[in-house]
Swiss-Prot record:
Top-level taxon in the UniProt lineage: Bacteria
PROSITE patterns reported in the protein's UniProt record: KH_TYPE_1, S1
Pfam families: KH_1, PNPase, RNase_PH, RNase_PH_C, S1
One Gene Ontology cellular component: cytosol
Coiled coil: none
Localisation: Cytoplasm
Gene3D superfamilies: GHMP Kinase, N-terminal domain (3.30.230.70), K Homology domain, type 1 (3.30.1370.10), Nucleic acid-binding proteins (2.40.50.140)
Family: Belongs to the polyribonucleotide nucleotidyltransferase family.
Protein name: Polyribonucleotide nucleotidyltransferase
Region annotated Disordered, chain positions: 695-716
HAMAP family: PNPase
Keywords: Cytoplasm, Magnesium, Metal-binding, Nucleotidyltransferase, RNA-binding, Transferase
Catalysed conversion reaction: RNA(n+1) + phosphate = RNA(n) + a ribonucleoside 5'-diphosphate
Amino acid sequence: MFEIMRKTIEWGGKTLVLETGRIARQADGAVLATMGETVVLATAVFAKKAKPGQDFFPLTVNYIEKTYAAGKIPGGFFKREGRPSEKETLVSRLIDRPIRPLFVKGFKNEVQVVCTVLQHDLENDPDIVAMCAASAALVISGAPFMGPIGGCRVGYVNDEYILNPTLDELKESKMDLVVAGTADAVMMVESEIQELSEEIVLGGVSFAHKSMQAVINGIIELAEHAAKEPFDFQPEDTDALKAEVKKAVGADLADAYTIRAKGDRHAALSAAKSKAVDTFAKSDANPAGIDPLKLISVFKELEADIVRRSILDTGIRIDGRTVDTVRPILGEVGILPRTHGSALFTRGETQAIVVATLGTGDDEQFIDALEGTYKEAFLLHYNFPPFSVGETGRMGSPGRREIGHGKLAWRALRPMLPAKEDFPYTIRLVSEITESNGSSSMATVCGASLAMMDAGVPLIRPVSGIAMGLILEKDGFAVLSDILGDEDHLGDMDFKVAGTSQGLTSLQMDIKIAGITEEIMKQALAQAKGGREHILGEMNKAMDAPREEVGDYAPKIETITIPTDKIREVIGTGGKVIREIVATTGAKVDINDEGTVKVSASDGAKIKAAIDWIKSITQEAEVGAIYDGKVVKVVDFGAFVNFFGAKDGLVHVSQISNERVAKPSDVLKEGQIVKVKLLGFDDRGKTKLSMKVVDQETGEDLSKKEAVSPEEAVNT
């Protein structure tokens, strides 16, 4: 019944098995990939003809994690998988980015790649397995795909690179680097880095590219036996048409790209496009003309040719800058004074308002992943409204691009966050892109760094980011610093680099051609370093160190540690005690299993009251210490004072004042706040307190004053 073909690849001490012919046989390509006990099914299907009027390449990649893969049932009312999680969206993009440039130019048939995680051993991350499986499925499908690609993850532990580290090894790694590429070149890089040098990161990319060759060769060997007949697709030759269009509007295009302002430049380009359409496009007046979609496609190619050639020949870019010049920068902080922290970061025509909000443990995001449930205390949300580019468009829930850009900025900033023990806040950053002309994700990194410092977050060091571009032709190449939107669109690379004065924290690279060499990557990283340092210097003009304290409108949090055997007493039966503490003091109390207690409130008095209460449960009152107390009952022989959480003690009438007190009720009233010193305990264990040895204004211990030696008295 089945014609099963299987390829086993020994890969870095692990075994990757690619199998086809048993499952999903009606798909154009289907591969079941297994590493360890992680299993992913990848399928590839493509339409056999393009839709009429199709003017772009409609590739869709869906990475889906089934909860049964980890032996779990989905939470929620419906008990089935719903909208994609953040990880599913990010991995879908991770697979899409290296395969998209490898389809034959001009191919506009719809392609859908679906990667389904069927089993997860909680050791081998399915994202790399899915990437390799998707590559294999496309290669054997017969689609005009110039692959295969390979992909792998690289860690860095004890100054050594680790291929495809396990989830446990990744926790100890200073680098989480994902690389995809062909046999000849790197296509995609995604990473989170703990302030490592450019040389170490570049070494990791080279290590990854060498390591993935085993997978690429294995896929080729599988395809030799399992691949379908190649789909007959011949890209249309448009060279003659391009020459005619260039003759008609080439000068107009060249003139348009000498205009520095984005809006004016786009208006001139639109006029040139209209002229080309009027001259060549098929219409009622010109029935023998060219199909408008085909004409627009040729027009875009001509645009790219003119811009790229100009940059390579002159070294001058669209807006008049040289290849390594960064646009003018202005950073401002505290622009929204009632928020916890805010910044406005403007670089040329790209601008972001970034707002930092500090919260408590209750504000952490609960994440239910295949690997288990956990809470995330650092959140970054990126919003890209259509008005930021002068357009109308869809508003609503974030798209894949917004989720991806937000995660890139999150990765760049996370290595510089303070330890949870030092700063026990939940941090939420929101980046509102208000203008965009290239590199809005890196503007988010810079603005977020400033906003957190404005909020009093003790960052280890500020972080800056820059987007690099590339123009690559047979006769040379140019690496561009701080690219514009047009340069991103017309260029060959989008290379985003973020880091501090000490090293890199994040790297993301997408190649639109068949890969780049190590030499180009090395130059891009070196040029990016200079750009990052310049941007960091401009940011430091706005703020170069975090504020010493959080703002007035932020919650205050203090942390104490209690013995784990006292946790039950603080919580109480059914949570009775902790609810009483919260209701009485007005503070929030959060206790974890290790005995760490976080107490938060809008003001310090509430926090102190809650902490004192908790200490009264978990600690014994200290003889000789002075406490704030409240009179709870006045009797003939003295007053009972609540002084240490729920603990009460007696201030005998003789200990109320240094002057004679006939009736305690003459000087004390119930509810009165007093300062008392714990004298000790009587034979029956009753607590003895004194007011008269404490200055009721300052809280000073008067008995210590009385005990001054004669020599000290003389000196005084």
